[in-house]
Amino acid sequence: GGDFDDYEREDATYQQAIAEARRTLGELGRVQVVTRSFLPNFLFGARDIVVALGQDGLVANTLKYLDGQPLVGVNPDPARYDGQLLPFRVSQLDPVMRDVLRGGRPRREVAMAEARLNTGQSLCAVNDLFIGLKSHGSARYRISLGQTSENHSSSGVIVSTGLGSTG
């Protein structure tokens, strides 16, 4: 059997961070906790301020569902996660959120990549978008930018935005 102590410590640290964040945010206004699995179904209000408490992937995933609302990325465990998209610690939430609420914190705009199929379907990504077959086969595709296009054949293409190029 394996040793699960580290997983238990990680979970305990995360649960403590959630509790502290809820306390801090609750003193500043209404709080609605949305789990990652419910994000695709949640409708954010135009005036909502969103706090993502987790790893970088949670920030990138959450951004896909926002339409101009500010998002504050919070690192629940700085000793464990580098958090390129998590500039704040839970202990910094109070002053950071007060700045955000009064509009005193600069916002960083995020560009998204969008892929459109000839079937009319589209897919957006905040960091990286893989375009290709699920299997190891080769695909034929056309890459276009403005009025210029090129035909290609390969196993696929990875398109990275500014967030996707963080490493």
PLM-predicted stretches and their roles:
Residues 61-76:
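Gly/Ser-rich helix-loop-strand patches that form or flank binding pockets
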Residues 36-38, 76-79:
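Short, ordered loop/turn segments at secondary-structure junctions
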Residues 52-54, 74, 161:
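Short His-Asn-centered micro-motif
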Residues 77-156:
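Catalytic core of DAGKc-family lipid kinases
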Residues 156-167:
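Conserved mixed alpha/beta catalytic, RNA-binding, or beta-rich assembly cores of soluble enzyme
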Residues 50, 71, 157-158:
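Short, well-ordered beta-strand core segments
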Residues 57-63, 165-167:
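Short glycine/serine/threonine-rich phosphate/pyrophosphate-binding segments
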Residues 1-49, 53, 87-107, 122:
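ATP/NTP phosphate-donor binding region
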